Amino acid sequence: SGSCTLETCWEKMPSFREVGSRLMEQYKGSAKVTGGNDGGTLIPEDSTVKPPSELDLVYSMDSPDFCEPNPRTVHSARRGVGCNSTSMDVGGCDILCCGRGYVEETVIFQVNCRCRF
């Protein structure tokens, strides 16, 4: 007589918070690169940075300085932008408001959400 066993395996997605945290870590550790002459190599602009792997986050152009007026946009005011007044990180009011000060306003709203995952 023989026996039969069945094993089923699957991978579980991490929580959105964990995914966001991992992306933020990669964002903070990202390196600016230029393309190599062979069309497939990425070369770090900073010679002290190791060449990126396929899993590293890289960028090729600097982000615009949103604190400086841009003649291509209609206005450069950052009014109505949500920020975290206690954070000293990228979402903090001091950074988002370019050190020009900000007014704190508490807004409470209710949203019906029928999210499914």
Swiss-Prot record:
Glycosylation sites: N84
Protein name stated in the entry: Protein Wnt-6
Molecular function per GO: cytokine activity; frizzled binding
UniProt entry tagged with the keyword Disulfide bond: yes
Gene: WNT-6
One Pfam family it belongs to: wnt
Location relative to the cell: Secreted, Extracellular space, Extracellular matrix
GO cellular component terms, semicolon-separated: extracellular space
Organism of derivation: Evasterias troschelii (Mottled sea star)
Function (record text): Ligand for members of the frizzled family of seven transmembrane receptors. Probable developmental protein. May be a signaling molecule which affects the development of discrete regions of tissues. Is likely to signal over only few cell diameters.
